């Protein structure tokens, strides 16, 4: 609950022209969230007529910073025989909103199933969560003697978050084949 206010009756004393309804105890939480509204509606007056302005909307403006999104490590490696690699993307704090971040895939390894499978995309970290995973899948254990190859994943264009300094992760596929 972000505030306290119960249904009730407003009494305007004889001779007065106004009364006050107090929204009490607005909670200053630390959760990044959208602005929220409280709508107070007047109804069923006695000894008076209800005017056209029978509702008031009060906006609780969120004052919390959006979380930072970035990789929890900037590099990792594994042998060709590793079938997949999960890259963890972290938020600095949970958010009350879904966070999305785009990612682009580059590097010296060839995607589309030749060396691995992972296309450019968008990661969604659900509201309340603090991390998500991008998976480099189907890492191919070929029999070619070749140099180690890299898969570079770069984060960009977050929504409901700001981009952190660790926005690039380099995964190295270590060749495990002997020279002919």
Set out the residue ranges of the language-model regions.
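Short boundary segments that mark the start of a structured unit
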Residues: 1-180
